[in-house]
Amino acid sequence: MANRANRHAARTEDSDNTINYVQCDGLAVMKMVKHCHEESSNMDLAQGALLGLVVDKCLEITNCFPFPKSGDETMDEEMYQLTVMRRLRRVNVDHLHVGWYQSSDVGNSLSLALLESQYHYQTSIEESVVVVYDTQKSSRGFLCLKAYRLTPQAIQMYKDGDFTPEAFRTLKVGYESLFAEIPIVIKNSPLTNIMMSELNELLPEDKGHNFLDLGTATVLENQMRSLIERVDELYQEAVRYNKYQQVVFKQDTEKHRALAKLAAENAVRTSKGEPTVAEEEVIKQFRPMTAPNRLTATITSGQINTHAQHIAQFCSQSLAKLFITESLQNAKEAKETK
């Protein structure tokens, strides 16, 4: 994904006030939804480019198109994008590249690939965003479309290439401060709103109850399985980090012991009028340990937090569906008895 950004564009510094909100046309939303649902049937990750323009502090997304599948080795992805945007320009359609979109995996989109791709996009195209579409949640009747941008701290950390614990503490970066969510608004034309109102009136009464389905076993099972996997990964990261701390503590203890011994020997040499040995000779024997990369652990922590929130929210929605279904059933029975 990273190579899909315009590598030759001038890199600019990120700013907190670049984009205040994202306005997405209904046509672009429908194209993203259609693409994501088609790819979800094949268990593939749907990704595509967002086209539009920036007006004041608003990023307007007016069109989009899917990326070619990565399995096609004969396809030049950058040339494909340039060709599509060139042809859109010929028919007077917004062709400015303003970001990209992708579907989410079991309701959780935070990953190392997402972070790296958005870093390359945002340092090439300052106003770019990533729009994430949750196919599972949307299929249950809750349209889930979210826009994200990397925070300035995350960009600085990635630019430095330093993912040590000290770097995370210095920049005050955690899983909650890697991405900043940008409010997203869906805009339709007045004619589209009128048509939607008419279609809503034509919808049979029973069809509106499809989203009250209480079959939640599969969704909870997938969420719990993913949560357990992420907890296991975080445990392995914690074990590796604890081993690193133990090795560092042991090395520091040995170094202090060696320095104390050298100080005593130097005192004896000084009393005898002999030259002392520099401490650097002892310090050279203890090479500093390389700190482990904490980026993976941070991302895994964010995934665990997201899964926990989704499970809690899903359970609340299921309880609400239960009470709504009960009320509708009682009203239906009362209507039939009359």
UniProtKB/Swiss-Prot annotation:
Main site of residence? cytoplasm
UniProt xrefs under InterPro entries: eIF3h, eIF3h_C, JAMM/MPN+_dom, JAMM_MPN+_peptidase_M67A, MPN
Q: Under the GO molecular function aspect, what terms does this record hold?
A: metallopeptidase activity; translation initiation factor activity
User: Where on the tree of life does the source sit, at the highest rank?
Assistant: Eukaryota
Q: MPN domain location, by residue?
A: 22-154
Q: Which UniProt keywords apply?
A: Cytoplasm, Initiation factor, Protein biosynthesis
Q: Which GO terms describe its cellular component?
A: eukaryotic 43S preinitiation complex; eukaryotic 48S preinitiation complex; eukaryotic translation initiation factor 3 complex
| Localization of this protein | Cytoplasm
GO biological process terms, semicolon-separated: formation of cytoplasmic translation initiation complex; positive regulation of Notch signaling pathway
The family classification in the record reads:
Belongs to the eIF-3 subunit H family.
Summarize subunit and interaction data from the UniProt record for this chain: Component of the eukaryotic translation initiation factor 3 (eIF-3) complex. The eIF-3 complex interacts with pix. Interacts with mxt.
**The protein's role, per its UniProt record:** Component of the eukaryotic translation initiation factor 3 (eIF-3) complex, which is involved in protein synthesis of a specialized repertoire of mRNAs and, together with other initiation factors, stimulates binding of mRNA and methionyl-tRNAi to the 40S ribosome. The eIF-3 complex specifically targets and initiates translation of a subset of mRNAs involved in cell proliferation.
Q: Which HAMAP family match?
A: eIF3h
Listed name of the protein? Eukaryotic translation initiation factor 3 subunit H
Q: Which organism is it from?
A: Drosophila yakuba
Q: Which gene encodes it?
A: eIF-3p40
